[in-house]
């Protein structure tokens, strides 16, 4: 139960930080335009109607399609969140759900996701992203690492035979 509370806090915190960071970035951009923060990082304004890296953004009804896809993914993640028995996995899913909700809120309010962080080195420019994207990416990576570690730990030899593995129940 405690992990669920921490997971819900993660959802709310990530969602709130994402929305605040976007509001701040929108305000900053409207007053100052694109701004270099570091040699490799700039504050920009990109309205992303597609998915990752702006893919499929030119589709006529992309916002509607991706809104429904986002809702489906969030609902699926929430079911997994509720069913999860692993504290760390619950927190990872909370971070992912919070980020996904942040981007969904943009789609519902603006018809596109607001991206404002641009990383670049010389002529190389990574597609713009936002705090929610970072949280979704980090949450998924942490969740996958936990799953790999859990499954590696769950396989144990019970017979002395190196080819005989069984699943250890925790």
Curated annotation (Swiss-Prot):
Catalytically driven reaction(s)? Release of signal peptides from bacterial membrane prolipoproteins. Hydrolyzes -Xaa-Yaa-Zaa-|-(S,diacylglyceryl)Cys-, in which Xaa is hydrophobic (preferably Leu), and Yaa (Ala or Ser) and Zaa (Gly or Ala) have small, neutral side chains
Q: Name one Pfam family in it.
A: Peptidase_A8
Q: Which UniProt keywords apply?
A: Aspartyl protease, Cell inner membrane, Cell membrane, Hydrolase, Membrane, Protease, Transmembrane, Transmembrane helix
Q: Name one GO biological process term.
A: proteolysis
Q: Which InterPro entries match?
A: Peptidase_A8
Q: Where in the cell is it found?
A: Cell inner membrane
Report how it sits in the membrane.
Multi-pass membrane protein
Q: What is its EC number?
A: 3.4.23.36
Task: Give me the Gene Ontology terms describing cellular component.
Answer: plasma membrane
The annotated pathway is: Protein modification; lipoprotein biosynthesis (signal peptide cleavage)
Name the catalytic site residues.
115, 133
TM annotation in the entry: 5-25, 62-82, 89-111, 126-146
**Which GO molecular function annotation, any one, does this entry have?**
aspartic-type endopeptidase activity
What family is reported? Belongs to the peptidase A8 family.
Summarizing the function annotation, the protein's role is: This protein specifically catalyzes the removal of signal peptides from prolipoproteins.
Q: Which NCBIfam families match?
A: lspA, PRK14775.1
This chain's protein is named Lipoprotein signal peptidase
Traced from the root, the source organism's taxonomic lineage reads:
Bacteria, Pseudomonadati, Pseudomonadota, Alphaproteobacteria, Rickettsiales
- Please name the gene that encodes this protein: lspA
